[in-house]
Amino acid sequence: MTTEFMLVTLSNQSADARWGEKALLSTGAEGMTIHLTGKDKLGSIQRAARKIDGQGIKNVKLAGDGWDLENSWAFWQGFRGPKGKRSVEWAPLPAAESKELEQRLKIVDWVRDTINMSAEELGPEQLATRAVDLMCDIGCEAVSYRITKGEDLREQNYAGIHTVGRGSDRSPVLLALDFNPTGNPEAPVFACLVGKGITFDTGGYSLKQSAFMDSMKADMGGAATITGALALAAARGLKQRVKLYLCCADNMVSGNAFKLGDIIRYRNGKTVEVMNTDAEGRLVLADGLIDASAQNPQLIIDCATLTGAAKTAVGNDYHALFSFDDALAQELLASAAAEQEPFWRLPLAEFHRSQLPSNFAELNNVAGPAYTAGASTAAAFLSHFVTNYQQGWLHIDCSATYRKGAVDQWSAGATGLGVRALANLLLSKAR
């Protein structure tokens, strides 16, 4: 059976007036034309692709001039959706750009597909296994890994992951993956990447309302994003050793679930009083950050869908960036600009570290009632588990990972945003 493709072309001219003032799309005997008359050409292409998909067109051919790498990618970002199959016959590209497009399609689509999976399909161990499979597909000869789960976590003092995940019938998991393309098992670790992998978040006994719980299959978006970033950096030729830690668990309600007032004792000596079981992401990340710090890398990046406060500040349109290292923060913003991905820096100051008071432990897992900068205090909590937190550490609160509903540029579901910027940063720092 022959597949019929709709031809899609680009034009810098306005559409015929019959299509309406400032029309983005027009249709003719030869196919459809996207009219790029505004300043945001990539955004216009992405919005046009959403409109084309919305008309039920699933097979397209990008024809004519103008379909370079970034324009082609913008089209796919808008055209792709979580339901049904779509196919694109791409315009010819130079070999290097064609390879880059192929890598993005493979890796960023993996991120989007993984985040969109239902919690029934994707538990903590399945998330870890999918990450291993992706990295092995990119460069298996450079990959080794260890999966620690269930009671082994408790016995090895991964107190945060075990505490959060023990209330679920599905065992919590820590994936420690070593990407070492140097061939030298004693090579220094250049960077450590830590991801929050909460595969479903009920909020625990600090129970979420349904309207806030219905998207919590995507609470592992940080783990998927940082895994995708490492995979893309590796595919682009990363030559330095990087370790990846995914802290995976379900946050459920049960007779064995953790409770308000519990004290968690971490391997670095910190004690944490739990006063909100829905602030669980920082509790699992702490274990990964302790391991990351022990490697003494030049760079530590953690990614997490950590707070609603960050999303309130920047919406679903940006990832929120926190760091004490001004130069490093600017490097990430430069990488984000180079890849046309949206990051926005939010405040993180030394005084935020003292806004987590507890009567019974060194730290509270949420800020005191007088301190309302929720995203900043969450980042500050994490800093207590990074040995040299003032240099070489970035925290990404992944607000742009997932959309509950479709908008003019995106279908509902995962976006894959952040993968390219973080891969770019890894490569630029590794040079």
UniProtKB/Swiss-Prot annotation:
It is found in: Cytoplasm. Mn(2+) 2 binds at residues 196, 201, 219, 280. GO terms for cellular component: cytoplasm. Its cofactor is Mn(2+). Binds 2 manganese ions per subunit. PROSITE patterns: CYTOSOL_AP (PS00631). One of its GO terms (molecular function) is metalloaminopeptidase activity. GO terms for biological process: proteolysis. It comes from the Bacteria. InterPro entries: Leucine_aapep/pepB (IPR011356), M17_PepB-like_N (IPR047620), Pept_M17_PepB (IPR008330), Peptidase_M17_C (IPR000819). Mn(2+) 1 binds at residues 201, 278, 280. It catalyses: Release of an N-terminal amino acid, Xaa, from a peptide or arylamide. Xaa is preferably Glu or Asp but may be other amino acids, including Leu, Met, His, Cys and Gln. Its EC number is 3.4.11.23. The active site is at 208, 282. Keywords: Aminopeptidase, Cytoplasm, Hydrolase, Manganese, Metal-binding, Protease. Probably plays an important role in intracellular peptide degradation. Homohexamer. NCBIfam families: PRK05015.1 (NF003450). Belongs to the peptidase M17 family. This is Peptidase B. The gene is pepB.
